[in-house]
């Protein structure tokens, strides 16, 4: 099986994790395993637990990483089919209560976008789906056909920053009165009709923001990210690091705010000196986000919007 996906900020993500021999690490978004393979090469001992909610990614990894999965009686890689918001629960099943590092590569993987039947892309005609975990019931078809006009407009504006969210929501509700909206191309046409012609000619594909917003809502991406970051930080051993790659401003804002919250000490009002023993939980490894090099930008278009933030547990 193939899972063709070029990992973004590969060396920056793993090198800043500062992996130590014998450590326990978590890949929260295993995907095609590009980051995992690089980390496993750097670790002569230790183990990696790879999470992915996409069964296709897990099945592919079972084949592509067979050597690491079956290494003697102590496999260096273990795979978990679950969303990364269940870190503590799943790691506890493996007898793990603390980790030395964790990394996230957020967003949709190339295979998910390129598999037309997954319904993620406005480039292919398929049934509206967009579920990262295909065992989940709720999908894009249900969202588009069941949310009321205000709910639709709110989703498009909040998660897609779509300035024509109200017009698009109104057009969706009008169209589905006749029959359900079933496919990606049907939705694309509705979006195009709702956006003024002048606006359609600039800023990329007119459906890009709406499709992002619907995907985020279907998969509860921002809620599960917040929950997962909290669990990850609590699981880190002292000196352990967390690396997070984001591809859109809402994700980056959550990561930045979470790291800021745990890297600062809240001093009670009127207290001039920080009491002894009170210290922050995290240290920011990089004050500003790390972005792709000129070389990577030229080779991988997906890297243009990527931002990496890294923090260390104190």
Curated annotation (Swiss-Prot):
Swiss-Prot/TrEMBL catalytic activity: cytidine(1402) in 16S rRNA + S-adenosyl-L-methionine = N(4)-methylcytidine(1402) in 16S rRNA + S-adenosyl-L-homocysteine + H(+)
Keyword rRNA processing: yes
InterPro entries reported in the protein's UniProt record: RsmH, SAM-dep_MeTrfase_MraW_recog, SAM-dependent_MTases_sf
GO cellular component: cytoplasm
Extent of the signal sequence: none
Broad EC category: transferase
rRNA processing listed as a keyword: yes
Entries under Pfam families matching the protein: Methyltransf_5
UniProt-listed Enzyme Commission number(s): 2.1.1.199
Binding site for S-adenosyl-L-methionine: 33-35, 52, 84, 105, 112
Annotated TM spans: none
Main location: cytoplasm
Superkingdom of source: Bacteria
Keywords: Cytoplasm, Methyltransferase, rRNA processing, S-adenosyl-L-methionine, Transferase
Protein name per the record: Ribosomal RNA small subunit methyltransferase H
Originating species: Lactobacillus delbrueckii subsp. bulgaricus (strain ATCC 11842 / DSM 20081 / BCRC 10696 / JCM 1002 / NBRC 13953 / NCIMB 11778 / NCTC 12712 / WDCM 00102 / Lb 14)
Gene this protein is translated from: rsmH
